[in-house]
Amino acid sequence: MNPSGSIGVLEQNGEEHLAAPILGPSVNSDNPQERIQARRLRIAARQEARRREALGEYLDGKKESEEEQSKSYKQKEESRLKLTKLLLCGTELVTNIQVAADIREIHRRVEEEETKRQRLEKLENEVKTSQDKFDEITSKWEEGRQKRIPQELWEMLNNQQVHCAGLVEDKNKLISELQQELKIKDDQYVKDLKKQSEDITVLLERMEEQVKSVMKNFRQELNYIEKAFESERQELLTTNKKKWERALQAHNAKELEYLINRMKRVEDYEKQLNRQRVWDCEEYNSIKIKLEQDVQILEQQLQQMKATYQLNQEKLEYNFQVLKKRDEESTVIKSQQKRKLNRLHDILNNLRTKYSKQIKQFQEDNQSLTSDYKRLVTQFKDLQKAIRHFIIIDQDKFREIWLMNEAEAKELAQRAFDVDKIIHSQHLGLPWKIPNFWFLNNVGPISLQQQQKSVTQILEELLLQSEDEGTETAMSEDESYMDLPNQVSAKTTKKILVLLCDESGFLIESKLLSLLLPLEKSECYLLRLDAIFSALGIESEDDLYKMVNFFLRFKAHHLSSAQVSISTHSNAERTSLVSALQHMSLMSQTDRRSSASKSDGDPTELEDQQGSDNGSLMGRELVEQEDLSSPMFIHPNDVLKILDAFVTGLKKPKDARPVQRLKKDTRNNLKDTEYWESLAMVIPFSKQNLWDALFKALEKYYLVLTQRAKLLMENDSLEQQNAEMQSLLQQYLQAKVNLELQVPPTQGFRMPSK
């Protein structure tokens, strides 16, 4: 700590400290802050020395680097050193007040410890002496009880009163001394507060002076640094300007040299072109001579071919004569075959009679089987109606039971949440947030998986419609065509299938056609389409939707291919139809995937996925919506052409994809299990453990409260007994017998107050 005289000099002559040498803090100083500062400066000096060694500088400052340091760098270093010294001096000047205050506080605490120790010793001595006096007084009470003469008893009481007064006087004297000491400490505390306020004012004044001096020196050094940078900038501008002029001169010389070299290269290229022309002329003459020789050789070969032609003509005449002889032999063989044919005709007539008999028998069997088939079909339809009815009833019952159990579970979960809220807010004092679980917002059973229908089921829904099932057929039609485009109706699809059935009869076996004759029209169409689709390889619902869309887009592709070229009409139409089929297969796959994931995905994501596939055809579908929906544009002669293109295009995507198997209309029990398990675990194990710990603590708290209640009851009973005893004592003291006594009992002790 610096003396007060040096502090005044530092306040008045702040700028002189920059030039005068400053004695740094010492490690051997008595001040701990000064020792800490000395260690920090020593560590900083070591780090600076390591940095200089890493940069290749020398510690003694005598040897610098090969390149001379710039003026700006020198000015920055000088300013940094000056400002560092100024800040160190200012910090020391400001912290002197704090150091002096700390020393005063240390001395005060030492004195306070000493006075406290003396006070405690004095109090202990006082306690011992007062205890001895009190013991002496209590021992004399026993002697007073043994005395029977009132005069001696009165003297003893006077002595006891004197001793008690002396004891009380000693206690009062001690209390007055402690109060006087407390008053002195209060005065000392007021003086310390005044001294601290004076130190704070001095500290603030010094800090303001230091801030002003530091600001002044910072501005001055900043001006010096700016001047150094400006002079260095001017020097750099002059040197760079000279370098730029030298670079321009070198660039001009290089450009001149480049022009000379370019002229030389142009002359060399002209010479090479002349040599190339001469070589091409010579090569042309040699090729011409070679081709003339080839022509002569070909003429010789032509003469040889004529000679061989003459020879072959003679051979053919000879063969003609041989064939004539063979024809005569064949006439003889024909007559023999005619006789054999007549014999076979007789056998054929016999077989026809047998065949007619068999046909009649088969027709009778067919009629009986057809009647049985119709009866079974009606029974099957009735069974389907009953199954649908029971499915709807079961679904309604399942939904009612689900909702009832779900409401009960959610009510229990809400009660658990209320209990958790009370525990958090009242017992734990923590904020409670309403949990947001996904299963709490669910109402009703989880949706069934979508079921993909087979081609036969769709054909039954389309063709086997009766007038008695008006509402049911409409519902089934809507369900079966849920994935078709919006512009395609069930009526249009039925017309396309009928047209396909009429024009593709060659794909059906003749035996099957003969068996289908006695059936009804709708059943006949159904079986014929089943055979056609099995021949074409159409097995799934997606393939049927592709074919319908393919037929509807045929006219647009037909017109576009006709405008391109008339000569290549068939090839262009075939390629356009195949490409359209491939594009539609991709569209149908994306549509099926999007419809299968509607219940799990986001509608916006589905639109984004379908947008990339359907974007190219969206404009044309909106314009041609009315044209595509009508099957009148499809000519019967074009049906086979469309089928050919569709089957060729269907082979590629069908080879790559796996065979889709029909799934039963089952529920996803895993989702149901997960849902009910989640409802059962609305309160996690961590909170349940917290509840168990809280329950144990509340049980302990209940035991403590019961014990306190018992103690309070005992206290009330004791108070009641005490009041009864006081009333009895009061009656005893107020009795008339006590007035006749020379020393009444009221003089020996005081009555307790209620």
Swiss-Prot record:
Q: Which UniProt keywords apply?
A: Cell projection, Cilium, Coiled coil, Cytoplasm, Cytoskeleton, Flagellum
- Spell out the coiled coil positions from the record: 98-388, 704-743
Provide the protein's localization.
Cytoplasm, Cytoskeleton, Cilium axoneme; Cytoplasm, Cytoskeleton, Flagellum axoneme
The superkingdom listed in its UniProt entry is Eukaryota
Q: Which GO terms describe its cellular component?
A: axonemal dynein complex; axoneme; cilium; cytosol; extracellular region; sperm flagellum
The segments labelled Disordered in the record are: 1-32, 55-76, 587-616
The record describes its quaternary structure and partners as: Component of the nexin-dynein regulatory complex (N-DRC). Interacts with CCDC65/DRC2, DRC3, GAS8/DRC4 and TCTE1/DRC5.
Family, according to the entry, reads as follows: Belongs to the DRC1 family.
Q: What does this protein do?
A: Component of the nexin-dynein regulatory complex (N-DRC) a key regulator of ciliary/flagellar motility which maintains the alignment and integrity of the distal axoneme and regulates microtubule sliding in motile axonemes. Plays a critical role in the assembly of N-DRC and also stabilizes the assembly of multiple inner dynein arms and radial spokes. Coassembles with CCDC65/DRC2 to form a central scaffold needed for assembly of the N-DRC and its attachment to the outer doublet microtubules.
Q: What's the protein name?
A: Dynein regulatory complex protein 1
- Per the record, the gene is Drc1
